Amino acid sequence: MAGQPKLKLSAASALLLVLTAWMVSSPPAVADEAQARTLLKAMTDYVGAQQSIAFDYDATLEVVTKDRQKLQLASSGTVSLARPDKIRTTRSGGFVDMETVFDGKTLTLFGKNKNLYTQVEVPGSLDNLVNELQKKFDRPLPAADLFITHSYDEITAAVTNVKDLGSGVVGGIECDYFAFRAKDVDWQIWVTQGAKPRPCRYVITSTGITDGPQYTVQLRNWKTGSEVGTPDFTFKPPSGAKQIGVDELKKVKDMGELPSNFTLGGK
């Protein structure tokens, strides 16, 4: 009609309108809290019952700069564990190439790209190791929350809201999809369907931090029991490797969670 302005929507704008309309008009997602909790408990029980586990993973750690730009640090690696007290992990992220080995008594942190390693006595279970790595070394293990002994109790203790969001496909595998909310933290998890439920993707959002940075880990090539084989949980220093102390390790560039050109509180 003459006199009326003509509006043109780009594909992205049209999609945004559709998504916004869905968010406003749709009823609460499947919203069966009891079923979501039951299926999550089944997964943690299954994973907790496995004496040997191995998988590969891809992870992204999101950081927010002081000018509120979001950046994602991508890494990939492997995990092999044997309950109750052995684990070997690797993490390669471009700026870092780390290996963590625990034989039930000694924890070794080895920077392959630097050929430097440190060792410390941490006797005890995997649960104890997870706590030590996070609190004393600021080096959390990939998806560690999902593999500790009382995983379900730990991850749901502070939950205030649960959503069953139906299903999704991760890495070509159909999964049940759940979202949980706690104070300052939202987390989502995708769990394979069937008799052997396992985590496929785990996303943690820090809602207590401006712009809500996320940590995402996607698990693949999952193995249990005899499929794992006989992993070696002893550390053998390669030729020329130098041992350093824990305090010195903290000062070495590109052996931590962030690249050397990143600083906490800034960019």
Residue ranges of model-derived segments:
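Gly/Pro-enriched, hydrophobic low-complexity segments
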Residues: 31-34, 38, 58-60, 108-109, ...
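N-terminal mature ectodomain segment of secretory-pathway/periplasmic proteins
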Residues: 34-116, 197
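C-terminal low-complexity, charged extensions that often adopt amphipathic alpha-helices
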Residues: 251-255
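Flexible, processing/modification-adjacent segments and terminal tails
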Residues: 31-39, 67, 71, 110-174, ...
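A short, polar/proline- and glycine-enriched secondary-structure boundary/capping micro-motif
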Residues: 66, 98-102, 111, 119-122, ...
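Bacterial N-terminal signal peptides that target proteins for export
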Residues: 2-15
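Signal peptide processing junction and immediate N-terminal pro/mature segment
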Residues: 24-31
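Bacterial N-terminal signal peptides
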Residues: 13-24
